[in-house]
Regions:
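Glycine-centered small-residue hotspots that permit tight backbone geometry or close packing
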Residues: 1-2, 104, 182
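Core catalytic region of metal-dependent phosphoesterases/phosphodiesterases
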Residues: 1-71
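N-terminal short leaders/motifs
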Residues: 7-29, 104, 113-117, 130-141, ...
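Short, solvent-exposed coil/turn elements at secondary-structure transition points
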Residues: 41, 184, 205-207
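Conserved beta-sheet core of the metallophosphoesterase superfamily
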Residues: 54-58, 78-83, 88, 93-99, ...
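A short acidic, often aromatic-flanked loop/helix-cap motif at beta-alpha or helix-coil junctions
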Residues: 63-65, 186-187, 207
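Intrinsically disordered, low-complexity terminal tails and inter-domain linkers enriched
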Residues: 68-78, 202-209
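Active-site-proximal loop/helix segment associated with metal-binding centers of metalloenzymes
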Residues: 73, 84-145
């Protein structure tokens, strides 16, 4: 769902070394299962790193998926679609333009040059700020924001799942099916989607386990 790394950008060489073992693990896992990686605002322009993992850029989001059984059969239960996105879409035009511009290949090549001649001061500053980030900050009135964001997806009645805000909120109401993931770095948990007569998200905790 994006932001898997504090900072990983295809053109910024100083961000690559730390990520290499994790990229290798993801590629190994992709031999056993399909892995979808939605780029976030801290990790993007990643296609060069992966051969098996399926990368979806900001421009390719949201991703609408048809849920099916483990045997590959299509389901016929209600709300059998789910829409995935990192969450930094459907923002104000100026902010959306800024996010798109920051992913520009030529701009990033230039920034990489500046970073190298300044002994990685730019990337180090970003990483330092990331280390100070409050991973469990609660956004005031996020439930209302979630409902507004849900409307922007235009697929009312189906589930929308986002990251980005890291609020660990599930809204399962008549007209709103919205799930905002928590920060994995803080919660150390993930969710399994169970499909019976309706969609359920089962949290799996990793705290205290050797993983």
């Amino acid at each position: 769902m994006g932001d898997i790394f504090d900072l990983l950008i295809g053109e910024i060489s100083a961000t690559h070394e730390f990520a290499k073992p994790y990229i290798k693990l993801l590629e190994e896992l992709a031999l056993k299962m399909e892995i979808i990686y939605l780029e976030g605002n801290h990790d993007f322009n990643l296609a060069r790193f992966f051969q098996r993992v399926k990368i979806f850029s900001l421009q390719e989001q949201p991703l609408k998926l048809n849920l099916h059984t483990s045997k590959g059969k299509n389901t016929d239960f209600k709300n059998s679609f789910i829409t995935l996105a990192h969450g930094d879409i459907f923002l104000s035009p100026p902010l959306q333009f800024a996010l798109k511009s920051l992913r520009n290949h030529y701009l990033l090549v230039f920034l990489n040059f500046l970073n190298q001649i300044s002994f990685n001061s730019i990337s180090n500053k970003i990483l330092k700020n990331q280390n100070k980030k409050n991973l469990f900050y609660k956004i005031e009135n996020f439930k209302n924001l979630a409902k507004e964001r849900y409307k922007k997806y235009g697929n009312l009645g189906f589930w929308v799942c986002e990251g980005h805000y890291h609020q660990n909120l599930i809204l399962d109401e008549k007209d709103v099916k919205y799930f905002n993931l928590a920060s994995f770095a803080y919660e150390r948990s993930f969710f399994v989607v169970e499909c019976y007569q309706e969609i359920k998200f089962q949290e799996q905790k990793l705290r205290g386990q050797n993983v």
